Amino acid sequence: MSEKKRISIDPITRIEGHLRIDCEIENGVVTNAWSSGTMWRGMENIVKGADPRDAWMIMQRICGVCTTVHAIISVRAVEDAIGAKVPVNAQYIRNMILAAHSIHDHIVHFYQLSAMDWVDITAALKADPEKAADMLKGVSTWSLNSANEFRNVQKKIQALVDSGQLGIFANGYFGHAAMKLPPEVNLIAVAHYLQALECQRDANRVVALLGSKTPHIQNLAIGGVANPINLDSQAVLNHERLMFVKACIDRLTDFINQVYKVDAAVFAAYYPEWLSLGKTSGNYLSVPEYPIDADNSKFMLKGGYVENGDLSTFRPIDQQKDEFVVKGIKESGKHAWYEDDEPLEPWAGLTRPKYTGWQDDGKYSWVKAPTFYGKVVEVGPLAYLMCGLAANDTPTVSHFNELKGIYEKLTGNTLTTDQLHSTLGRIIGRTVHCCAINDILSAQWQMLIDNIAKGDMTAYIKTDIPANGEFRGVGFGEVPRGMLSHWVVIKDGRIENYQAVVPSTWNAGPRNEQDQMGPYELSIIGTPVADPTKPLEVVRTIHSFDPCMSCAVHVVNTENGEVTEVKVL
């Protein structure tokens, strides 16, 4: 007789809101799942009636982590509605901010937010620092991959253990049966975790210098950016500041290529089973990003759509406002706590809350369920990777092949495209995405320098909001967690309606109008769970989508009502 249990992991929190995952586990395997966003956003209602020029400043408050991306995509939506042109200098500056923000996001996710799902901190005490340094020879030239550095890190870990307080490493699933890294790899990972804390500061320095501060940048405007350019002035974007940005980019490049890329390959090498777990629908959607002209028509990063995991079905998306994309998006509230059940296009979308309590077969989430031509779609770095490989995009293919080469050198095995439809495939996709946008960050810096050298200092074109009439616009972007879109209706100079379809909506959504599971839900079906009170395996896959994390999760045993507190790192 089969044994069935239900667990509730609540909350797995993210900055956009709080996430609850419910699972039914039968004979040690997840057989059913529900993904529930447990906090209502409602930001769309806040901007109704507001001046469209203020929307970006308000909408970036949706999130405390992805602030920058919401600001930029909101500006694009209003600019699209009124037909505003953007000077190329402004595009370059926006792109540098977006790229640096995305690099910061990816580094923080891999090391600070998800690495502890795979790394046993205490096992690092058993490592041989000399052996750890030798393991990386031939795959990395990072200067801090030395026995002395690893020995110092080991001493720090020992001091934490001896104090009885593990600090930032407290409350992990250390000793869990699913932890498989050798002691030396655990030590390497902890060392790189600590080094990443310093490295990610360089990415934030770029955002803060160009955006005036971070989080919540201040330099945007409809029609450009508020960054006066004068190479000889002390108070604006000058030669000194631009060279400071270049120094930050150079340091980021070294860390990303010699540490981050290698570590992702190492994780894949030691956890091969996670190259077969975590698959969703196989439908992937991404949009082009990093515009380099005033009309938002030429981009440095390609987009596209892949269906059923078959790269031969790839359809390129060359424009952010491709009619194929705009017409395909609808959101359903059938299983969400809103009044309107039928799928609606975002311009007509309504945000009318209707809380009913949890209903397995009814409404159970504050997140709506987006579909693309009626299909469940995954967005994010894996979607970017699959579309980039299908398009034979040069930077995507190049960086993937480098990571693949490291994996094959470590294992002697071939990393196939079919294995990418997985939990670790998602992490590999994020790594490749980070490498590609780091190249773009460097290129955008050079393009800005070259354009200034030609005498072009323009960064803003004054644009008025029409006082009369109705205008509709949409801003798209390919941001760290995937395709983001903001949809605005402007009437008589004010915002009539506003909807944001965020990456987390696509991936964390509940069942749709056809009762099809969302990506989070699909991804954990078939996942083995060794210990229901420590559901590390479920958390690994959910974290691979890059939700921000909570420090405390509660697992409820419905058989006896016992609540077991579980700390998630």
Regions found by a protein language model. Give the residues of each.
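Catalytic-core signal marking the mid-to-C-terminal active-site face
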Residues: 496
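A translation/RNA-centric and nucleic-acid-associated enzymatic feature enriched
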Residues: 486-491
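Active-site bordering "gate/hinge" segments
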Residues: 1-481, 492, 502-569
